[in-house]
Amino acid sequence: MLDNLKQLHDAIESGLRDRLAGLDRVLAYPEIGKSIETPLVAIELAELEPGHDDGTGRVPLIGRMQARIVVDPLVPGADILVRELSARVLRAVHGETWGLPITPGKQIGSAAEDPFRPDLDTYLVWLVEWVHEFDLGERVEPSSQGREIRWGVYPEIGAEHRGDYVDVAIAEEGHP
């Protein structure tokens, strides 16, 4: 059973870095700014769905992982490089558990060009997707203190109606 999703991300990031010798930029959720260093393998958990119920009362999850292989199109041989790196990522994730209690990685769909990230339009980008099934620990980590959330109903919204808002935390406890 995984303690949390960070454990999964850290293991995949570290495992891919080990298996893709010479490629230092393997990152989970990298900040994509005006420019990025390439080549880059950017990993993320794209989707969670219910897994196969084994009758134990636990709720297994199937996590769909994505790796975007990003290459500068101006580098000589970029078209082959993006495909080569995609094939290496496919080979690395196939059957891999990253040392965790999860099912072996299984590719879904095909590895192909990824036209769906406008922030990466100036790069060559290929997408590799695979799944793992796992149980996630029952303990929920406390979230960091966020901003105050108050609930208002239109049209009584805005600063002039601040006193009419309902404090969400108090409302959840059964108080108006």
Give short role names for the model-derived ranges.
Residues 1-31, 48-176:
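Charged, amphipathic alpha-helical segments and their flanking helix caps
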Residues 37-48:
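A short, hydrophobic beta-strand-centered structural micro-motif
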